Amino acid sequence: MNTPRIPIASHQAVMRCLRDKLQQANLTLQTDYTEPTVSYQQRGATAGTAWLQHWEIRLNPVLLQENQQAFIDEVVPHELAHLLVYARFGRVAPHGKEWRWMMESVLRVPAKRTHRFAVQSVQGKTFTYLCDCQRHELTIRRHNRVLRGETEYRCRRCGKTLRHDVKSSI
């Protein structure tokens, strides 16, 4: 996969935030964690992921460009916190008490589990499914699982199995 081109100013802002938060964590925790690798390989509606064993943060270049300062202020510390929690506590719940503590007490950032960025520009095709009470939009991955007979999905409200609305797909 080609590495997306990120404006140098955006990359510098990401790295400045990362280094500031890492230094803050090292001082607070009296540790000497090294700087993780940063790549811009994240795709889809996911803003970022922390690759624990690789000590790497992968960021979504499209969402970074569309939401620059909010992305840097929220996503970079969020993913760094995952790495720091893994280094300090090992495998624990992804957004559990250790992660919340790392975000709020160490990095001093509100502990939000998900972003609220607009994702229309990065969202893939969806497929309409129906139940007895509403319409549901399934991703292509979930749609293909239904087609292959690997799974079925149920409505959380009425409990009925979702059925593909073929008319809306034409």
Swiss-Prot record:
Its main location: cytoplasm. Its cofactor is Zn(2+). One of its GO terms (molecular function) is zinc ion binding. It is found in: Cytoplasm. Keywords: Cytoplasm, Metal-binding, Zinc. Binds 1 zinc ion. InterPro entries: SprT-like_domain (IPR006640), SprT_Zn_ribbon (IPR035240), Uncharacterised_SprT (IPR023483). One of its GO terms (biological process) is response to stress. Transmembrane segments: none annotated. Coiled coil: none annotated. The keyword Ribonucleoprotein does not apply. The active site is at 79. The keyword Zinc applies. Belongs to the SprT family. This is Protein SprT. It comes from Pectobacterium carotovorum subsp. carotovorum (strain PC1). The gene is sprT.
